Structures are given as structure tokens and as C-alpha cells.
UniProtKB/Swiss-Prot annotation:
Mutagenesis / variant outcome for changing E59G: Abolishes association with the ESCRT-I complex
Protein name: Ubiquitin-associated protein 1
Region of interest (Interaction with PTPN23), ranges: 260-290
Region (Interaction with ESCRT-I) location: 1-95
UniProt-annotated location(s): Cytoplasm, Cytosol; Endosome
Phenotype for F472A: Strongly reduced interaction with ubiquitinated proteins
Substitution effect: F268S: Abolished interaction with PTPN23
Source species: Homo sapiens
Amino acid sequence: MASKKLGADFHGTFSYLDDVPFKTGDKFKTPAKVGLPIGFSLPDCLQVVREVQYDFSLEKKTIEWAEEIKKIEEAEREAECKIAEAEAKVNSKSGPEGDSKMSFSKTHSTATMPPPINPILASLQHNSILTPTRVSSSATKQKVLSPPHIKADFNLADFECEEDPFDNLELKTIDEKEELRNILVGTTGPIMAQLLDNNLPRGGSGSVLQDEEVLASLERATLDFKPLHKPNGFITLPQLGNCEKMSLSSKVSLPPIPAVSNIKSLSFPKLDSDDSNQKTAKLASTFHSTSCLRNGTFQNSLKPSTQSSASELNGHHTLGLSALNLDSGTEMPALTSSQMPSLSVLSVCTEESSPPNTGPTVTPPNFSVSQVPNMPSCPQAYSELQMLSPSERQCVETVVNMGYSYECVLRAMKKKGENIEQILDYLFAHGQLCEKGFDPLLVEEALEMHQCSEEKMMEFLQLMSKFKEMGFELKDIKEVLLLHNNDQDNALEDLMARAGAS
């Protein structure tokens, strides 16, 4: 009883879904009632069926048609049987005479009719095309012996592969050393070729020179006999009057600069020269950097450099002494601005420099060459460089050695700090926009306002250039574009209103 009561409690009239509203779709709603037109009434189906009288005329016609087809087929069979019996009787009566007549008629018919093109297909009929047939030996012989019918205007050779002219070409391997020797003979004379022949390793001999010696000899010979070669990074390091040219690639350790310096010049060959007989040491271009005389004294040159500057050397900035990797293990104190004379423009000593100065000399203390910065050409940039801290100066030197000028690097460092990546990004974007023809001042304004969006920078520069050509002031243009977010129409209206008010 208890179980029945529990079941009645849960499954009786009570439900958890009572008084819960539900939204049902249109397809679950009861359809609306449709009213029939006045006077419409359905006929009684039973009465209609009773009144219909079916005569089965179509079925009767179908049966009659089938019986007629059977009669026609039986008549055809009887006619075929009669014809076969008549032929059998004629053959039995005629005997050998009939056979000869039949064979004569067959040969006559075959002689008059032309032979079929394909006897196998000609023997097939439409009703027996799927039945297998035996191939007669005469047909195969006729097919084999019959010559192919070739048209006069058809040439099979036209469709054959033509000979490739490269098939008969003899491939030869290139002897790189032989080609190099021929090139050097034509450009630098027989001495270079003789040097190369002496340095080439002989087969089967134990006297094989090392790669470094060969490279060093080639570099020395190239500098001696090719003075018009492009700047290739060779540094003239004369040792007490004897100029010895060494490559940056060779590992050279430079000692600290003593009171009497052995370094007389740090130079690069010129890019262009008319006199091909001059030595490479005489073609040293003057650049702005620290230099010393033969007796170790520093010279303050107040005259501007008349020769080509460092930026003219193939588009690269001149490498200062800081570019050289020193192997010296001792750390030398840096030369401060108080210990150095005012080095506004320093010229490099060449081999044909003036005699040693007889006046009082200043002997600086020993310092690391890597701590001497490249001097900027602008005095203002030089003064700003002297005011920087050692870390900031190192950052500037790092970016300048990549090919940028001191002025641009100092300007970028003021805005981006000592982060080299941000400085390089700023300089790269600045250079790209300047190459597109925009004013450098406008480019700096755009980079300052829109640092992250290249599209907005381009739009800002185009509008700035357009409004500047119209005659508006740059200050007003900048304020208006910043206020209206580069909206051309609103900015132009604002500029016109300001111009009218003024």
C-alpha cells in the first residue's frame, strides 16, 4: 500500500511542470478551422463506386494482341521448315551436277565482288556480332602479305625526335686554379701568376703551404700591383718606416700606444684615382679620427679636410680605432677630454707627412685604442658626444659602426634612450620615409606622434606636405591633424577658420 501511495504521489495528478510557462512553435499549435464555401458537399463514395461500370476493354485488347503475335511466329517457323525441306530435296536430286553449278556460281560471285577490307568484320552480321568466330588462314596470310598503303605526302621522319645539339657537346670541367691564374696574368702581370704558381700545392709532394700564408701573400701582391682596387678594408701598418699592409681578416694583436708610436697611418685606398702608378700607401684618404706623428705627439689640425671624407668610401663610414679587436690583456684608462687637446678635426699622418714637430709635445698616458671614439664632423655633435656617459658613448659607437652618422644617432638616442634595437628601428623608419621624398623635420614629427602605425605616419606626412604647400604654418597643421585624427576635411576647415580669424 505504501508503494502504491508513493507511486500515486509521484505519478498522479501532481507534476513538477505545472504552472511553468512554455513557448511552443507554430507547427505545434492546432490548425485554424477552414470554412467551406456555401453549397459545397462531398459526394458519397460508395454510391459513386456502385454507379461505375468497368468493361475491361483494355485487358481484352492486350490478350488479343499477344495471341496474334504467337500466330505470326508459328507461321514463320512453318515457312522456314518448308524452305529447308525443299532445299534438301533439290540437293538430293541434283547430285554432283548441282554441286558443280553451285561452286561455279559461288566462284563467279566472289570474282565479281571486290575482296572485303577486313574479312573478319565483313563476315560478321548484326545478330551474331558477339559470337566468337574462327580466323581463317587465308585471311591472316592476306593481312600479312598486303603492303601498307602509304600516302605520298606523308613522311614518318617528320614525327621522329630531332637530334639535340647539346648531345654532341663535350662537357669539360673547369679548373678553378687555372682560370684564376689566367685572370691574374691578364690583370696584374706575370709576377702575380708566378706567385700563384709557387703557392699552389704540388701533387705528390710534401711541401704544401698553409692557407694563411697563401692568403697573406695574395693580399700583399694584390695591394702592390692593383692600386685601383676598390676599398677592401686593408689597413696600412708601417713599422718604423717600412710599410707593411695587413688584412683585417688576419688576426693581428696591436700593443697599447706607447710614447713613441709605431703606427703612422690608418688609411684606406681611394675609390677613384687617375694615376695607376702610385702606391696604396700614398692613396690614403684623410678622415676624422685620432692620429699621431712619428714621435708619438698628437697634432691638432684646425684646417678642414679637403680630401674625401669617410662617408665617401663606398658609402661606408670610416672604421675608427675602436673597430680593431685588441688582444691586449691589460685594461688601460680612458683618455678624457681634459687630458686631450680640443680634437675638433684630426687629420691622419701619411708616409709623406711633415718632419716631427720641434715644439713642446704632449705625451698622453697609455689608453686602450677601443676607447677612442670616431670624431663626428659637426662640432655640436662632438660636444654632445663628450657630454655622454661611457655607456651612452659605447651605444653611439655601436650604431655608428653600422653606417649611421653621429648626428642621426644622437638625435635618435635622445628620443629612444640607450636601447640599440629601438634606435635602429627609429633610424630605419626615418631613412625609409626620407627616401620617399618627405621632409626630415616632418618625418621626425610623424615618428614622434605615430610611433606604432606606419599607415597613420604615411597619412600624416601626406597631409602635412599638402597643407604646407597650401601655405599653412607647420604648428597649426600639427595641432589640427592631432585634434581631428588625420581627418582631411575637418582639418582643412579648422585651418581655414584659423587663417580667417588671424
